[in-house]
Amino acid sequence: MACYSPRCDSPYPYADWDDCESVSSLGSFGCDYDHHEEASFQDPLAVGDDDVFEEPERVHGPIVDICKVDRMSEEEERMAIATRKAKEVAKELSETMSGKLRWLSDFTCDKPGPKRRKKKGLSMVDYPTLGSEAPAGSRIKMSKIGKGCTLVMASGGTRVEGSHPLVREFNGEKPPKNVGRKSGPAWFGYLSAKNATDKKTGSKQSDKEVEDDWTFVSKKGKGIQPEDAKPQGVKHQHAIRRDDRHRHGMRGTRYGAPNYGYRYQQQQCPVQGQQSRGQWQRRHCEGEGQWTQRRPAQQQQRPAQQQQRPAQQQQRPAQQQQRPAQQQQRPAQQQQRPAQQQQRPAQQPPQKPLRKRKPPPTNQRIVKPQKPKTPEPQPPQQDWFDSV
């Protein structure tokens, strides 16, 4: 059945695989295939043989829709040209508008502006000249406008990328909110044609202000007042919440004192000034203000430490006195503990806050224990372990 090339006459046809490189699966079934002339095999699909691959006949008739324009009347032809031009104009307009609006998503629009202005309205950055001379890809020319001016957008146009409140409202992502006015969105100047009548004042805009259906409305009696252009979250009424006053929120009002933005005012706190320092320490976070409780205890430990020094000075002359000197140190350490125990009842119990503030408890009120009569401490010499 299967015919192999005479070089591969072993009982296992693929035993010598190095000699039989040209043997293929097709060659084992059809003997008329020449193994040594592989290029003579032609793919019927590649040649396009009609017997192997038939395709339906292509009808090369004239397409009627292409030639239809010639047979149209002049009016229809004019309409077709007008619609085509309108589509091109609309496409070009959308490109230019997206180019003009690119400044809104720029990072400079989110900056709060110069430091002297505390309002969070539209910042006084350089606004673009909305002329058509700047191509869509290039950087838009900037020009300053007046301090109280507001940018008013025309209706229509493409979506704008950006998280600025005006951008999001222009895209229609959030519903307009009443800011400082009885009705209407936060900005409403949808001017769709030149010399359009402003909706609020009814006055006609001049040709200089209206340019490419985009308008800068100044605050001199025309159009939108600058209060209307603020982003949604900022309302400048006089009744302002305390946590809006500073960026740290209500942090300073924890103790009832209106010290905005300051963390802790221990000395000037008018409400809870009567409480002792142990109460202050309990209110603080860990590691904050705990030194106030340790201070009196440290001053009571000092006479106990002065008792340790003569004990060390007695150790210096001879090493045999180390052990009795260490036994003298132990009662000195035991005197530290009652010194700390004396300090705890010395705190005042929390009283009701009075209007007059008493001075805080100082170290002078604590009765210092009498120093035991010891020889005066000598000037510091070498330590006893250095003399060994």
From Swiss-Prot:
Protein's UniProt keywords contain Coiled coil: yes
InterPro entries according to UniProt: DUF5892
Coiled coil: 68-96
Composition skew (Low complexity), residue ranges: 265-279, 293-346
Biased composition (Basic residues): 233-251
Biased composition regions of type Basic and acidic residues, renumbered to the chain: 166-176, 196-208
Keywords: Coiled coil
Record keyword Coiled coil present: yes
Region (Disordered): 162-388
Name the UniProt record assigns to this protein: Uncharacterized protein 89R
